[in-house]
UniProtKB/Swiss-Prot annotation:
The keyword NADP applies. This is Oxygen-insensitive NADPH nitroreductase. NADP(+) binds at G150, V151, S152, L153, M154, G155. The gene is rdxA. It is an enzyme of class 1 (oxidoreductase). Keywords: NADP, Oxidoreductase. It comes from Helicobacter pylori (strain HPAG1). InterPro entries: NfsB-like (IPR033878), Nitroreductase (IPR029479), Nitroreductase-like (IPR000415). Reduction of a variety of nitroaromatic compounds using NADPH as source of reducing equivalents; two electrons are transferred. Belongs to the nitroreductase family. One of its GO terms (molecular function) is oxidoreductase activity. SUPFAM superfamilies: FMN-dependent nitroreductase-like.
Amino acid sequence: MKFLDQEKRRRLLNERHSCKMFDSHYEFSSTELEEIAEIARLSPSSYNTQPWHFVMVTNKDLKKQIAAHSYFNEEMIKSASALMVVCSLRPSELLPHGHYMQNLYPESYKVRVIPSFAQMLGVRFNHSMQRLESYILEQCYIAVGQICMGVSLMGLDSCIIGGFDPLKVGEVLEERINKPKIACLIALGKRVAEASQKSRKSKVDAITWL
């Protein structure tokens, strides 16, 4: 297995940024779309619950409809080659004896994981559906991080979007998928301008060594 050397890693980490405008003429190839989808699918999650569903929007009219319900991101979304809608599962779907969890794992894995997961729901969450919902969103955001970094490895760009009306965007999508519960959006494409210099805390402020 080959790994990026330190120089290439640092360059990639510094070049990745929240792209605020994309090349509207750039169209993803089917290979690129499949690769982005696979990056999303392979994302890690606690107990391997994978409590998400990814909707890849490439249809320009549909992107435009969704963009109309974003806050200050309309032109950026319309310029993107694709828009990934990250949907979260509902807490009821993650109950240990429900259909989703019972059919998610191979039998040999299920007999080991399900009892432990059920115990965690009681000990950590006190069987609170609200806490379980927060847990589900945490897993979705882990996937979002992997997607954005993976897209950078492909030489492409992204922007995570939290500013949108989830109910209105859900209404746009409801004709095509069943009542989506939307965690966030990710605009995807090719940048039209170089990223500005990255601004981050110093190592002293950001990291404590013990």
